[in-house]
Each structure stands twice: as C-alpha cells, then as structure tokens.
Amino acid sequence: MKNRHHAAKDEEAAKAYAEIIKAMNEQLEVLKEKIKEQTEKPNCKEGVKRLETIPAIGRMTAAVLFHHLTSSKFETSNKFAAFAGLSPQQKESGTSVRGKGKLTKFGNRKLRAVLFMPAMVAYRIRAFPDFIKRLEEKKKPKKVIIAALMRKLAVIAYHVHKKGGDYDPSRYKSA
C-alpha cells in the first residue's frame, strides 16, 4: 500500500491510499495490544519471558513460538523444526549425482516467516559465532546460514520451553 500511495498520480487515489494505510496501522496497533494482553496472562507470561531470553527473539516472536509449542505436542525438537518447515531435504536419485539440499516447504509457513527476522538479527549480531563461523568457512551462502539459524532458533525454543528454564548460552555455544 505504501508503494501505491507513493506512486499514485491522482490526488484522490493518494488520499484513499493514505486512509487505508492509516486504518491498517490502527488495526495493527490493536492486534499488538491484544497479543501483549494475552502474553501477560499468568498461563503465558512465564513461558513467553523464557523464550525472550533467546538471543534475537522478541515479544511477538516469543508469543508465536509459545502458541505453537503449547498448542501441539511435539516429541522432539526435530519434529518441531519439521512442523515449521525447517527440515533439510536431500535431493538424491538412484544413480544421479547428489543435488543441492534445501529446506522442505512442508509445515507452517507463518511460523517459518516469523523466525526469519530473528535469524537475520542473530546473524547480524553474531549470536552464535562458532556456528556462523563454521558455516562461513564451508563457503555457505548467507541465505543458507540464515535458514540454518532459523532452524537453530526453533530447536532452542523447543528445548527452552520443554526444560522450563531460561536460555543458557553455554549449552548452545558450539552447536
């Protein structure tokens, strides 16, 4: 909408876009306030706070992760990562040369999307320096490293939620 507002040649169209943008921003603020209210409830507050101790995970991401971790029973962190669509997929065929691997696109697209920005932040602030350095030494592209960080954040969130304690950097230092 902002692009359309900026590119509008007609004054009335620009005014209509401005009103739509204003209404959407107001709705966004209402939704953020509702999420904040939900995360302040006693049954959510502690779990969300624990998830916020993970580097690069903010309130909104923690709320989404908490929702998915509590609404479904995952037996392992790998199953949670698969649910988020963050499992690596190997491309192999009988006699062919092994193809490039990729992430499966199965799973919850929204959960995968929510983990993208925290992974970008984790990359930028070097939240997991040994992990990032190891991937960079293998000449992995930045997007591959971001995807690996998304999976790592999902796995850490699972363990923080399951164990019931805060994030412990020494536990995930070299992984």
PLM regions with names:
Residues 12, 16-19, 23-26, 30, ...:
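Generic recognition of short, well-ordered alpha-helical interface segments
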Residues 10-18, 41-45, 55, 101-105, ...:
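Conserved phosphate/pyrophosphate-binding and hydrolysis machinery centered on Walker-type P-loop NTPases
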Residues 2, 25, 116-119, 150-161:
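Short, amphipathic alpha-helical segments that act as regulatory/interfacial helices
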Residues 126-175:
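Acidic, carboxylate-rich catalytic segments that either coordinate divalent cations
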Residues 18, 48, 52, 59-66:
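Short, well-structured alpha-helical segments
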